[in-house]
């Protein structure tokens, strides 16, 4: 997914590293409820299930997934990074 051309400064950052399903999505849901329309929530995760759970969450609830990427952290472990804009 490529980066959009608008301001991507997150209103909320969630560190869900080390948490397993369903906790990352539950935390995202709480953050989205507390934010206002157009706000961006940034999520960092280590659970591979977020790679399909977060896109489904966005589609189902009408939020925009601006960024979904994965990379290796300093310990060579896979990490997931998301930017979600509240619809």
State each model region's role.
Residues 11, 38-42, 79-81:
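Intrinsic-disorder/low-complexity, polar/charged segments enriched in Ser/Thr/Lys/Arg/Asp/Glu/Gln
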Residues 1-2, 87:
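Iron-sulfur (Fe-S) cluster-binding modules
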Residues 2-36:
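An N-terminal amphipathic alpha-helical segment
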Residues 22-66, 70:
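Amphipathic, hydrophobic secondary-structure cores in small proteins
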Residues 70-87:
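C-terminal edge-of-domain segments
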